[in-house]
């Protein structure tokens, strides 16, 4: 017991640099396996620079290792695309995160072994193995690594005030003037934002694990009110462009290959998605940058998986080509020339397979950039929601370009798909002005179209599984996500998630008026309800996308920026924005979540995995029935008289004609 108190006392007297060093080694021992740590050390030591005994990485080494473009590097040339030039942004983030949990006083940090250890732990979310109180929430930490902030300057006149509060902490600061002064982004703010009160949970948990809370309090004592921290639009734009490209990346994948595959058309598609995501931050995107309040709100409600691709990117540190055991085994049993061909990482991985399953048509809407955009917010499985991480596959179900603009064709293909699906609609704004903007809207539907969502079972686990909740979204021109109401399963029967008929067309999130003999045609039109809705006319030529500013009565979807957990605090509003769309294409993609990493135990609904086979069986049955109905056996008896009687009956029924009648068999 005495030894424990002595250790706690010595840690409280340690400098931030010493505590940061201790935390890094605790991360290394608790968050990595011995094999992973061996690979990490080899990657670091084989590339590190040595300056007066200090081994570290610089920006160029980091960018080359991660395989990301770096305009500041020696290999930058005239053909280097500035859109994907995220090397300086990543280096800036890493330099900030390497100072954790003392970003105020130690950032930007030199990329030493200890600093990069902490960066990898934070960006791969492995800190839960050490920081029990730490929320799995990196939003503020990531904001701080991206924000443009002034350097903290603690003037002498502020010191007496600080000493009156905690002389011991200031004594540590005075006794250690050698470290560089850091950023002010994580200092306590003089604001009334409730959600920022616990934003330092990760840092607090880190210092609690070291029994060094007093040092942490000193690091957080600098007033942030004089700093207007914002994320530069240019900085954020370059980061989003990179994340869109590397979204399909897996830990042993090749980042440089994903980037090299981008041609001019792909770059244009990426820029369109970047503009859409930036526009989601509202007027701030056109002014001085993005504030923390907007950054946190948008990421929490409509882009929860935006930074997921950084996890496999930084897991590259845990795989060294020099220590690849598979290469060594091959080199012993093959010729020397084969050894060269085995220098690439293992090509087989569930994440490297194509997301698109083979089918009758290729998409006129979906591309790689759009698929990456969908992965930033769409939850297709549980507990791994990201469609690139959980092995989700998309099966082509319906295309208006391929199958025709007909509700009959739509129902034939959609009603035979008994699994979750994604509806996508692309068109242009139908306005009187000469300018027509491209519009792309869609919806994720966890239940088959044939079954009403109001009849689905309501299990307690469904509230934890976001893949069981529908959502309505817009990808162009502005990223918008309308999450499902937590009570959407208990709504009245006339408020289904999705419905369609030959009279009213396709309706998502609408109230469907009851039909009767006295009802006029306009009385049967679906009516927008809740936070938003999508209505497509029966001809599949025009659509209406409605987004409400508040809760417009009961409805399936919530307004943008509102999550199910906070829906009760949102005020009602009758104001809404309506976008009229001239439809160019409609597609429905079946979601086939296959989780090879987790096995079928976590996904007991095996019918979802067999949806492709079930649809094919249904179509084969329909084809056999159609052929059977076309083949009419005229010989109903043993002689010609019975055959003639059967023919006469069929003629009277109007099924066949008598122009080619002959008593003989053909």
Swiss-Prot record:
InterPro entries: TLDc_dom
Residue ranges of domain TLDc in the record: 364-592
Domain of life, per lineage: Eukaryota
Annotated segments matching region Disordered: 329-354
Subcellular localization, as worded in the UniProt entry: Cytoplasm
GO cellular component: cytoplasm
Basic and acidic residues: bias regions: 329-341
Family designation: Belongs to the RTC5 family.
Protein name: Restriction of telomere capping protein 5
Native species: Coccidioides posadasii (strain C735) (Valley fever fungus)
């Amino acid at each position: 017991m005495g030894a424990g108190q002595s250790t706690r006392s010595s840690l409280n007297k340690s400098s931030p640099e010493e505590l940061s060093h201790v935390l890094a080694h605790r991360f290394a021992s608790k968050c990595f396996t011995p094999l992973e740590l061996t690979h990490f050390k080899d990657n670091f030591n084989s590339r590190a620079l040595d300056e007066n005994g200090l081994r570290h990485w610089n920006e160029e080494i980091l960018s080359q290792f991660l395989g990301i473009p770096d305009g500041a590097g020696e290999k930058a040339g005239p053909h280097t695309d500035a859109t994907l030039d995220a090397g300086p942004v990543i280096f800036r983030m890493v330099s900030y995160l390497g100072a954790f949990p003392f970003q105020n006083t130690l950032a930007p940090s030199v990329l030493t072994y200890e600093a990069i250890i902490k960066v990898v732990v934070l960006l791969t979310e492995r800190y839960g193995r050490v920081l029990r109180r730490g929320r799995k929430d990196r939003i503020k930490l990531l904001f701080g690594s991206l924000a443009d902030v002034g350097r903290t300057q603690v003037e002498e006149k502020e010191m007496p005030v600080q000493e009156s509060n905690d002389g011991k902490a200031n004594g540590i600061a005075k006794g250690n003037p050698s470290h560089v002064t850091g950023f002010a982004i994580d200092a306590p703010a003089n604001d009334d934002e409730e959600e920022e009160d616990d934003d330092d949970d990760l840092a607090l948990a880190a210092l609690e694990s070291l029994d060094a809370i007093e040092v942490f309090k000193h690091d957080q004592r600098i007033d942030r009110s004089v700093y207007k921290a914002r994320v530069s639009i240019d900085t954020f734009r370059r980061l989003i462009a990179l994340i869109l490209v590397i979204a399909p990346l897996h830990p042993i994948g090749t980042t440089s290959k994903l980037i090299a595959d981008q041609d001019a058309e792909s770059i244009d598609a990426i820029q369109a998605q970047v503009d859409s995501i930036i526009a989601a931050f509202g007027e701030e995107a056109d002014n001085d940058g993005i504030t923390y309040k907007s950054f946190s709100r948008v990421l929490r409600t409509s882009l929860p998986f935006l930074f997921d691709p950084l996890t496999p990117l930084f897991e590259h540190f845990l795989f060294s080509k020099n220590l690849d055991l598979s290469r060594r085994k091959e080199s012993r049993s093959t010729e020397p020339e084969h050894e060269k061909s085995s220098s690439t990482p293992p090509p087989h991985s569930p994440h490297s397979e194509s997301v698109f399953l083979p089918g009758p048509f290729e998409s006129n809407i979906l591309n790689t950039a759009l698929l990456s955009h969908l992965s930033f917010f769409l939850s297709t499985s549980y507990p791994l929601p990201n469609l690139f991480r959980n092995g989700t596959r998309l099966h082509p179900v319906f295309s208006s370009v391929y199958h025709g603009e007909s509700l009959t064709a739509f129902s034939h293909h959609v009603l035979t798909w008994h699994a979750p699906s994604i509806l996508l609609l692309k068109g242009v704004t139908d306005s009187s002005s000469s300018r027509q903007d491209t519009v792309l809207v869609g919806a994720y539907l966890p239940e088959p179209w044939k079954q009403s969502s109001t009849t689905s079972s309501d299990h307690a686990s469904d509230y934890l599984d976001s893949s069981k909740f529908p959502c309505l979204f817009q990808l162009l021109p502005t990223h918008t996500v309308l999450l499902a109401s937590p009570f959407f399963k208990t709504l009245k029967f006339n408020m289904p998630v999705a419905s369609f008929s030959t009279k009213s067309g396709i309706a998502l999130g609408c109230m469907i008026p009851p039909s009767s003999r006295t009802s006029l045609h306009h009385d049967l039109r679906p009516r927008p309800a809740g936070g938003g809705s999508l209505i497509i006319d029966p001809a599949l030529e025009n659509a209406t996308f409605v987004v409400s500013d508040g809760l417009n009565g009961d409805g399936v979807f919530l307004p943008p920026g509102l999550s199910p957990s906070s829906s009760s605090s949102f005020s009602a509003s009758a104001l809404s924005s309506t976008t009229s769309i001239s439809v160019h294409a409609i597609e429905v993609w079946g979601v086939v979540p296959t989780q090879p990493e987790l096995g079928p135990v976590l996904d007991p609904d095996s019918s979802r995995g067999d949806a492709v086979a079930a649809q094919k069986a249904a179509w084969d049955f329909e084809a056999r029935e159609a052929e059977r109905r076309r083949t009419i056996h005229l010989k109903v008896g043993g002689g010609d008289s019975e055959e003639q009687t059967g023919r006469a009956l069929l003629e009277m029924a109007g099924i066949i004609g008598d122009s080619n009648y002959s008593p003989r068999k053909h």
